[in-house]
Each structure stands twice: as structure tokens, then as C-alpha cells.
């Protein structure tokens, strides 16, 4: 499924827990709160040049909303949310929703479906090459003096006499937009509007995430 026709949901990472199968196996899952997703704008081919649904999640004080955004939301008749995202969809999908309509989780996801989850990874601060790029440490002894966790040589010979751009070195790690692909939906809680996804997803507790139908789901299933 391509991004051009996949409606997703915005949510907040609640935390992790585990579920038990009928066989007694423990399955680690991440709980995502996807309640209160509502449409702020329906974009059409005639008016905007492409078809999409603009969705907001959560709630925010009116004093925290910029004037342009406040006018946009007032026109839609929608309460201000904490984040706004846009999903490219088909004209058929866009026709199912009107401005201000709620998007329940059962409309988008089902148990066993593959999803991609995008969020902001946990910031780790300044990190070395071992942690940042998964490089191997050097020898602990046997002639190694104070060079255990250094990257080693970073340069070339006299020609070209410089470090090439893109060389993996130390630097800031984390706090970046990250996507984890092909995760399984284990449970859909319609009553509480919760999505239980197998495994870990990017970000810390309370962080915002975007959940979409998996882009590479068909390719991965066909490979098996």
C-alpha cells in the first residue's frame, strides 16, 4: 500500500506492557492512545491539486494557538489540537469524512494488520562512534594504550589530505524523526480508542506518534 492512499491516525505513546496468548506466550506490546482524531480539512483535486485528509489530535489552550491556525480551525469548527498532520488518501476515502468528523480507530486499523509508526526518538545527547554508529571497540589490552573506544583513523593519505564528507564520527544521538516499519497490530480497543502494537515504537512515554498502514507490508509478506 502506498502513502498516496493510506489514512493513518495520530496518537500518543502511553507505554509498554505484555499480553499473553492462548498458548501462554508473552507478547510485548506498546499502547498508543489514538482517541479524539478529527478532520480539520478535506483537500480535493479540484481545489488543492491533490486529495488528502488533514487530521488533528489532542487538545490545546486557545492562548497557545497562532492566529493563522486559530482562523483555520475556526473555519473548520474544530477544537485546537496539539498536532496536525496530513494523509494522502483516495477520493473514495476522502468522501467518507466531512470537516469536523471524528476518525475512530476501527475505521482505519484491524487486528493482524501491519503498520508503520513514526515518532521522535529519545535524545541521547553527545555520543561516541561506538554507541552512535554501532562500531566495534578496539582491543582492551595487548598494546592498546588509551584507544579502546576511539573510531581509529578518520583520514586519508597526503592525497586527498582531507576527511571526506559524511564520515561517521561522534555527535548528537537521538531526538530525530524515526520510523519503525511492519509492526503487527495485536489489539484494537474501540471503547477506549487504544491501539496495541507488537514491539517497541520510537519515542518516550507521552510522545506523539503517527501510525499508518505499512508501506512495505505486501513485499515482506510475499518474501515469506
From Swiss-Prot:
GO terms for molecular function: rRNA binding; structural constituent of ribosome. One of its GO terms (cellular component) is cytosolic large ribosomal subunit. GO terms for biological process: translation. PROSITE patterns: RIBOSOMAL_L3 (PS00474). Methylated by PrmB. The modification N5-methylglutamine is found at residue 158. InterPro entries: Ribosomal_uL3, Ribosomal_uL3_bac/org-type, Ribosomal_uL3_CS, Transl_B-barrel_sf. It comes from the Bacteria. Gene3D superfamilies: 3.30.160.810, Translation factors (2.40.30.10). It holds the Pfam family Ribosomal_L3. Keywords: Methylation, Ribonucleoprotein, Ribosomal protein, RNA-binding, rRNA-binding. The keyword rRNA-binding applies. Belongs to the universal ribosomal protein uL3 family. One of the primary rRNA binding proteins, it binds directly near the 3'-end of the 23S rRNA, where it nucleates assembly of the 50S subunit. HAMAP family: Ribosomal_uL3_B (MF_01325_B). Part of the 50S ribosomal subunit. Forms a cluster with proteins L14 and L19. This is Large ribosomal subunit protein uL3. The gene is rplC.
